[in-house]
Amino acid sequence: MATEAASINFRGINGRGMGAPILLIMMLAMIVIPMPPIALDMLFSFNIALSLVVLMVTVYALRPLDFGIFPTVLLITTLLRLALNVASTRVVLLNGHTGTGAAGKVIESFGEFVVGGNYAVGLVVFAILVIINFVVVTKGAGRVSEVSARFTLDAMPGKQMAIDADLNAGLITQDEARKRREEVGQEADFYGAMDGASKFVRGDAIAGIVITLVNIVGGFLTGAALKGWTLTESLSVFTRLTIGDGLVSQVPSFIIAIAAGLIVARAG
C-alpha cells in the first residue's frame, strides 16, 4: 500500500509543471557553486529582460486580477536577484584583481559605459537610484498594498451580501453568483498576498545597499591586504566592479518595484 501511494504521489508530482522547483534549485546552485562570467552575463541579461516583460504585462493588465500570479512572480524575481548578488560578489572578490572584465561583460558595461568609468559618479548614481527605489516607489507600493488589503477584506461581507441579494431578487443566476463570489475571494487573496510580497521588495532594496557596502569593504581588503595594492588601485578596480554589480541588480529591482506600484494602485 505504501509503495502504491508513493507511486501515485510521484505520478501526480511528475504531471505538474516543474518550472518553479527547477528555478529554485538553480537559485540555490548560484549561491553555492562558483559561476563563470559568461553564465553571469546570461543570467543578468535574463533578469533585466524578465523585469521588462513583467512591467509590460502589468501596464497592459486591465485589472489586478488579470495578473493574479504577480505576488509569486515578485517573490521569484526577488530571490533571483539576491542569488545573482551572491554569485557576482563571489566572482568580483575572487577575480577582481584581474581587471574590470573579471565579473563578465554586463557588469563591466554598467561600470564603464553607464557611469563613464568614474566610480565616484557611479556611487552617486547608485545612491540616487536606491533612494528613489527604497524611499519613493517601494515604500509607496507597500503602503498602497497594505491599505488595499485592509479595505478589500473589510468590504468582503458587504460584497457577499450584495451578491446574495441579487441572486434572491433573480437579477443573476447561480453560475453568475458563484463566479462573483470567486472573484471577491480572489481579489482578497491577491491584495493579501501583495501586502506580504511588498515586504520582499523593501527587503531587497535594503539588501542591495548592504551588499554594495560589503563588496566595497571586501574588495578593499582583498586588494590592499592580500594583493598588496594601494588604496587608490583597490578603490579604482573593486569599487567600479561593485558599482557595476549594484547597478545591474538595482535596475531590474527598480523596474519590478514600479510594476508592483502600478498593479496595486490600479482601481477595479
Regions inferred by a protein language model and the residue ranges of each:
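Alpha-helical transmembrane segments of integral membrane proteins, especially early/N-terminal helices
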Residues: 9-12, 85, 89, 206-218
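N-terminal accessory targeting/assembly segments
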Residues: 2-5, 20-25, 31-32, 52
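N-terminal membrane topogenic signal
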Residues: 8-21
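Juxtamembrane helix-loop transition segments at the membrane interface in multi-pass membrane proteins
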Residues: 2-10, 40, 47, 55-76, ...
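Hydrophobic alpha-helical transmembrane segments
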Residues: 20-24, 30-48, 59, 68-78, 113-139, 199-200, ...
